[in-house]
């Protein structure tokens, strides 16, 4: 892989939604490209989500980070909280420092907005993601189990 200094990280615009939708499909394959594209339009245009795409020196998209602002996040001390909704590095870019670079861009954005904490989540059994978050300087705060009950019966 090329050196990390050859990477360009750019804010997502409506013109780059199709590229981001393709990468989202790689991260979350249970949803179609079309569903991801529709979701992006809604989240970015109507709900204030911010996102960045990382490109290699050939202009190929190799990663992304999506960030929202939440009024509260479990385990955080301050409000509001910048929240990483999704982060992805193409397989050949994992453990290259690209994830760290994407998180740094999100941190800088949050600081510029006057936000004092950034948070994220992952499944408890996703050890690779948990390790990556610790490498990026995150501290685990708590593990939550969600419950549901169908009320339509």
What are the roles of these predicted feature ranges?
Residues 89, 95-108, 131, 135:
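Conserved acetyl-CoA-binding loop-helix of GNAT-fold acetyltransferases
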Residues 103, 110-122:
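Conserved GNAT acetyl-CoA-binding A-motif
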């Amino acid at each position: 892989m090329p050196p990390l200094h050859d990477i360009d990280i750019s804010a997502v615009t409506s013109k780059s939604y199709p590229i981001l939708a393709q990468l989202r499909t790689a991260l979350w394959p249970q949803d179609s490209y079309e569903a991801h594209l529709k979701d992006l339009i809604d989240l970015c245009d109507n709900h204030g989500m911010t996102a960045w795409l990382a490109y290699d020196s050939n202009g190929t998209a190799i990663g992304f980070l999506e960030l929202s602002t939440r009024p509260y996040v479990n385990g955080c001390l301050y409000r509001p909280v910048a929240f990483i909704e999704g982060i992805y590095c193409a397989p050949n870019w994992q453990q290259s420092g690209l994830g760290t670079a994407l998180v740094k861009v999100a941190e800088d954005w949050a600081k510029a907005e006057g936000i004092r904490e950034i948070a994220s989540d992952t499944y408890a059994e996703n050890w690779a993601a948990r390790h990556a978050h610790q490498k990026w300087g995150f501290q685990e705060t708590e593990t939550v189990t969600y419950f549901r009950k169908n009320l339509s019966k």
